[in-house]
Amino acid sequence: MANRERFSRFIGFGSGADIFAPETPYGLSKRVIANSIRETPDWHNIRIFGVFDENELSTRFIKASILRYLNKEPMQIHTDRIMDFFYMKDLVSVVDKYLTEKDPPKEVNCSYRDKHTLSEIASQINELGHHRVGINIEQAGMSFYSGKPLEMDVPLIGFSKGLFDTFQILSDKGTTV
């Protein structure tokens, strides 16, 4: 660490892949980084399983599902799973807390207490507007990509409100695929 004296705190953005896919190159790299962070004073790991808002790529599950809904097309799920999606504004609040708190936790998961399957999220999207679309699940089965809930004193907007706000913004823009 040749430049260690140039900063007082390091914040790394981890991934659930370091837990659920450590055999992949991406998961292995995230695991190595997480282990390095654990061993280094004043280094911190903010683990993200999934993050969403209206600015995410149109290919990401939540935005793609909202856009399909707005276009009156069925939503697509490859394999249903329990998945932790964290609202971007809540992630910003977590990062802000790390920047301003004297001794933040060494590691946190950006994960809400309430867990949702992809099919439940699609059903929630279906309830946000005035029509209904189909929900196609391509492959049977259930897995999870989820972590222990965030344990920090940070005011959070939460998943449901974040989903509603994202839907409203995309709906107001008249966004289409």
Mark where each language-model region is.
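Conserved Rossmann-fold NAD(P)-dependent oxidoreductase catalytic core, especially the SDR/UDP-sugar
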Residues: 1-28, 44
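Residue-level preference for short coil/turn positions at secondary-structure junctions
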Residues: 6, 39, 71, 103-104
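Structural signature of the Rossmann-like NAD(P)-dependent dehydrogenase/reductase core
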Residues: 9-14, 44-50, 84, 109
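Short glycine-/acidic-enriched loop or helix-start segments at secondary-structure transitions
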Residues: 21-23, 55-57, 87, 119-121
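NAD(P)-dependent short-chain dehydrogenase/reductase
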Residues: 27, 31, 35-83, 92, ...
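C-terminal substrate-binding subdomain of Rossmann-fold SDR/epimerase-dehydratase oxidoreductases
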Residues: 73, 77-177
